């Protein structure tokens, strides 16, 4: 049976931009890296408003409507996301990576406005209970190893998001509510520093993306040309890996400018969050010997602690990496 789903007004970027630890490992020429990542966002109903205060989620969705305080009820959302990433070493210093996501989202709404006009009711109907699932947008990364020493490993490159997601009609114009069927181009630099201590790594990743113009549907059901705000991300992580055990933490900050076409006034966004990860695998043994199939499995938890115009949504993640 053919099913039609509506893309929710999501308030966090999907794909790997907000995924857990962005650890860069060298990929020799003609070597494949396969990573499978499962992300689970439990049900949440809170958000940071334009003043950085925690408010009900519907206050964020209806931020530009004066009647939002008259709406009663609750809006709940949750998400499951499965990503497959395949990277290939083109040469000793160049690599290419593609990430294909499968997404399932559920929205539960009991929103009600007793004296709503017909146009206001259309907006509330756009936030009704529903479930949508299907493929997400594919992302491609082309990168080059900039410098490699015993203490430093630096990589830079370009990222491309392709509008391949077809799980529903993109809807909503919050700056970071881009949903599926969206495209962008960006660049990143990742600096890894290895102190003179076995298994310890520090990393800083700087990334920026230019969001391209596409078509969307407003909450009123009108199709418009739309561009999400351009964004910048900063990651800092610290980790230790010894005797096949991995542990680390990462701080992430992102900022996104106001959306464009047709609205965008006062909806700039930022978010601060912290992640913790623990893992097991034989990657640390590569320092002593060659392995037929290097691998690692990690479990992570991410929690936001400050933000503006973005949901308060914790995430759990399970990832596995293999080289062959």
Where are these regions (language model features)?
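Transmembrane beta-barrel strands of outer-membrane/channel proteins
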Residues: 34-42, 98-102, 156-162, 204-210, ...
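Short sequence motifs at beta-strands and strand-loop junctions characteristic
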Residues: 70-81, 129-136, 179-184, 226-230, ...
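Transmembrane beta-barrel domains of outer membrane proteins
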Residues: 85-87, 139, 143-145, 188-194, ...
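Gram-negative outer-membrane beta-barrel proteins
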Residues: 21, 42-50, 104-110, 148, ...
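Outer membrane beta-barrel transmembrane domains
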Residues: 56-62, 124, 215-324
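Short loop/turn motifs that connect adjacent beta-strands in outer-membrane beta-barrel proteins
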Residues: 21-32, 93, 147-154, 196-202, ...
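Outer-membrane pore/translocation modules
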Residues: 104-227
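Outer-membrane beta-barrel biogenesis signature
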Residues: 18-62, 285-291
